[in-house]
Amino acid sequence: MKRSLFALALTVAALLTERPARAASCSFDTVTGLSFGNYDVFAASPTLSAGNLAYTCTGGATVTITLSIGSAPSFAPRWLLGPPGAHLQYNLFLDAGHATIWGDGTGVTGLYGPNAPADNATVMVPIFGSIPAGQDVPIGGYSDTITATINF
């Protein structure tokens, strides 16, 4: 009889003991970059594109995501670099209406989040891009490299 009670007491103690907290972790799963295609210097409307990034977190992380400036000296506008000395102004946005520039949350920029995703759930985040119309730039390839940082 004493053995049964002792075993029962250990079981109850084990059930009441706190589990150690699991460290939060997050990572990007995929990033689909933006491709603006051919830019028409005579077009009256901006050239638009969209991409997305996907991330997964565990351990109850609350997430924000920032984007770097890229090649430009500031967020507004960013630059796509082309032939020597040429750049094409563009920007990346948090919303399809292009109201909030996606940056690091300083100045004129916003950032994604905070968001508390479900544990181990993949979250897709859209990225919206726009090249303003009316830029007289030389023919050639233009590109920029942006770093996305997930903070948790």
Predicted regions: what they are:
Residues 22-84, 114-152:
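N-terminal small/polar-rich segments of proteins
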Residues 7-15:
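Bacterial N-terminal signal peptides
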Residues 1-4:
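Positively charged n-region of N-terminal signal peptides that target proteins for export
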Residues 29-30, 101-110:
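Short beta-strand and strand-turn-strand segments in soluble, beta-rich domains
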Residues 85-92, 99:
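Extracellular/luminal ectodomains and secreted, surface-exposed scaffolds of diverse proteins
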Residues 18-20:
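N-terminal signal peptide c-region/cleavage motif recognized by signal peptidases
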Residues 68-70, 91-95:
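Predominantly extracellular/luminal cell-surface or secreted proteins
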Residues 41, 95-97:
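Residues that form or immediately flank small-molecule/cofactor binding pockets and catalytic motifs
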